[in-house]
Regions:
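Register position in tetratricopeptide repeats
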Residues: 2, 20, 50-54, 96, ...
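Structural marker of alpha-solenoid helical repeat scaffolds
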Residues: 2-3, 37, 69-70, 113, ...
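TPR-repeat structural position
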Residues: 24, 57-58, 100, 134, ...
Length: 278
């Protein structure tokens, strides 16, 4: 293919077409040719950085290190993103070792690279909480909520944070501050879980006060759920009503044929019913 060497943008265009076709070796050649013709072509620099990033972070970092200051400035977002990825991996390794304070220090560096990031703030807060710096963790999440009051990601992250620290009612109240039309599937799933927890908590209290029939009636009014069916099965098993227990476990298995709790429960019921019959 004959290309007019004076027109670096024509070569860049060929690189973009190759990139769109995922023909990365050809895209790399065209972008390199573009840079030989015009070292200031920031689109070619960006194209190469993205190709190398797909291959490995190390290759992308080596490429970035070889650039001139002005070329490097044109892709500072890619450089920040690579740095962020590397810090995230290091922080995760420290979290897995229980080194929470060291992990938090790395999360702070990530937040400096990406200020206001909901999920980095969440991870930093979780690490601080685990490191015993709980008021600092709470303050970070509260400030984030004030900065981004109508951001569904923030609402979901703060809801997760609160519910993870035994503050289910506060989590629900926070979620309800966001108009329902803005709820995403993650928020809806979290709300369902929190409401289900509250219902089960109330039902367990009723049962413990001797009102098992009332507790059971309350659970049966709820939308079908594996947790509720397993609870009803467990209660029936404890009062040796094996027919009811078996029916509740079967309900679970109809929805989730591989549910281990229901399979084990049914086996226990069959053994207990056999002993009773014998």
């Amino acid at each position: 293919r004959n290309v007019d060497n004076t027109d670096s943008y024509a070569v860049l265009g060929l690189g973009d077409v190759a990139m769109a076709r995922k023909d990365y070796p050809a895209a790399e050649r065209y972008y390199q040719q573009t840079l030989r013709m015009d070292s200031g072509n920031t689109n070619a620099v960006r194209g190469l950085a993205n190709i190398y990033r797909q291959q490995s972070p190390e290759k992308a970092e080596a490429f970035i290190a070889s650039l001139s200051a002005s070329q490097r400035r044109s892709i500072d977002d890619i450089e920040r993103s690579l740095q962020n990825d590397r810090l995230a991996q290091q922080a995760e390794a420290l979290e897995n070792q229980g080194k929470w304070a060291q992990a938090a220090a790395l999360q702070r560096q990530r937040l400096a690279l990406d200020p206001g990031s909901v999920w980095i703030t969440y991870r930093l807060s979780q690490d601080l909480w685990q490191a015993g710096q709980r008021s600092q963790a709470d303050t970070l999440m509260r400030n984030l909520a004030q900065q981004k009051p109508n951001d569904p990601e923030q609402v979901y992250a703060y809801g997760l944070y609160l519910s993870g620290h035994d503050q289910d009612r506060a989590a629900l109240a926070h979620i309800n501050s966001l108009p329902r039309a803005q709820w995403n599937s993650n928020i809806q799933e979290l709300v369902n879980r929190l409401q289900s927890d509250q219902v089960l908590e109330t039902a367990n209290r009723l049962r413990e006060s001797g009102k098992e029939a009332e507790a059971e009636a309350m659970l049966r009014q709820q939308p079908p759920s594996t947790r509720i069916d397993l609870t009803l099965a467990d209660w029936a098993q404890q009062r040796r009503d094996y027919t009811a227990a078996r029916a509740a476990y079967q309900n679970v298995l109809t929805r989730e044929p591989a549910n281990a709790d229901a399979i084990l429960g049914l086996t226990e019921v069959d053994i207990a019913a056999g002993d009773q019959a014998g």
